[in-house]
Amino acid sequence: MQGRLSAWLVKHGLVHRSLGFDYQGIETLQIKPEDWYSIAVISYVYGYNYLRFQCAYDVAPGGLLASVYYLTRIQYGVDQPEEVCIKVFAPRRNPKIPSVFWIWKSADFQERESYDMLGISYENHPRLKRILMPESWIGWPLRKDYIAPNFYEIQDAH
């Protein structure tokens, strides 16, 4: 079964993979990193003008990294929002995904957190730098293959 956005993307020849619906009935799509920016723009034009949240996770040790976007479209009133979940998978060695900051400003801190914790580089993000960890921190703490240091010093903690 296809959702509205998936059917619209198929109708216009845009490559994606439907992952079905979650337990709340939200359509979930998989998009390739190289197709993500154009599909994000199209989604915005189609009416998904609110990025509810963005997060990222490590699929498996040595596996892919995923960036997840929940988009909301309010067409018939705030009590009937239409939502879609889009997952963009990137290779672990050099994870690059186009930033959607220029489409949805709310992606700013969320993409920075995903970069800081998992090392996903969001291309064309205006301020992509660590947001939670010190700039001197080595590694990506939420990766499943991350080895925590035996000792680290917290400086200037008051």
Swiss-Prot record:
Cellular compartment(s): Plastid, Chloroplast thylakoid membrane
Keyword set includes Glycoprotein: no
EC number, as in UniProt: 7.1.1.-
Any Pfam family hit: Complex1_30kDa
Reaction equation(s) it catalyzes: a plastoquinone + NADH + (n+1) H(+)(in) = a plastoquinol + NAD(+) + n H(+)(out); a plastoquinone + NADPH + (n+1) H(+)(in) = a plastoquinol + NADP(+) + n H(+)(out)
Domain of life: Eukaryota
Gene3D superfamilies associated with the record: NADH:ubiquinone oxidoreductase, 30kDa subunit (3.30.460.80)
Membrane topology, as annotated: Peripheral membrane protein
GO BP terms: photosynthesis, light reaction
Keywords from the named record: Chloroplast, Membrane, NAD, NADP, Plastid, Plastoquinone, Quinone, Thylakoid, Translocase, Transport
Hydrolase recorded as keyword: no
SUPFAM superfamilies: Nqo5-like
InterPro entries in UniProt: NADH_DH_suC (IPR010218), NADH_quin_OxRdtase_su_C/D-like (IPR037232), NADH_UbQ_OxRdtase_30kDa_su (IPR001268), NADH_UbQ_OxRdtase_CS (IPR020396)
Molecular functions per Gene Ontology: NADH dehydrogenase (ubiquinone) activity; quinone binding
GO CC annotation: chloroplast thylakoid membrane
Cross-referenced HAMAP family: NDH1_NuoC
Its job: NDH shuttles electrons from NAD(P)H:plastoquinone, via FMN and iron-sulfur (Fe-S) centers, to quinones in the photosynthetic chain and possibly in a chloroplast respiratory chain. The immediate electron acceptor for the enzyme in this species is believed to be plastoquinone. Couples the redox reaction to proton translocation, and thus conserves the redox energy in a proton gradient.
NCBIfam families: PRK12494.1
Family designation: Belongs to the complex I 30 kDa subunit family.
Subunit field text: NDH is composed of at least 16 different subunits, 5 of which are encoded in the nucleus.
PANTHER family cross-referenced by the UniProt entry: NADH DEHYDROGENASE [UBIQUINONE] IRON-SULFUR PROTEIN 3, MITOCHONDRIAL (PTHR10884:SF14), NADH DEHYDROGENASE UBIQUINONE IRON-SULFUR PROTEIN 3 (PTHR10884)
Name of the protein in its database record: NAD(P)H-quinone oxidoreductase subunit J, chloroplastic
Species, as recorded: Calycanthus floridus var. glaucus
